[in-house]
Amino acid sequence: MKTAFPAAWFVTGTDTEVGKTFSCCALLHVLRNQGLQAVGMKPVAAGVDAQGRNEDVEALMASASVAAPRALVNPYLFAAAIAPHIAAAEQGVRIELAPILSAFHALRAQADVVLVEGVGGF
């Protein structure tokens, strides 16, 4: 579908808990109401609940109009609710760009619009 919306947006904020996920979910609802296939992506997340899920990732998935696999929506998930680069180091994981780009391109193939939510703040 041809759209006046950009094909991808990056959403960032000045800190954690400032409304990035809330804003992404609101935008996903607007895009869905415009008849667009839209999906959220949080490439790197930290902090999981008892079921091993991240609340931001779950909110993005619930708001999307595309049922994308969790592994594409969130390629890197760390259990500890700390800065992702620290959590990655503690788990011996190196956050690589290639898996993130691969997931992004797979989502772009399924949706008119992809909203990418950054971690923390800048």
Model-found features: residue ranges?
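Conserved glycine(s) of the Walker
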Residues: V18-G19
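N-terminal phosphate/diphosphate-binding loop that engages ATP/GTP or pyrophosphate donors
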Residues: T3-A8, F22-R94, A98, A103-A106
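Switch II (G3) loop of P-loop NTPases
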Residues: I100, F104-F122
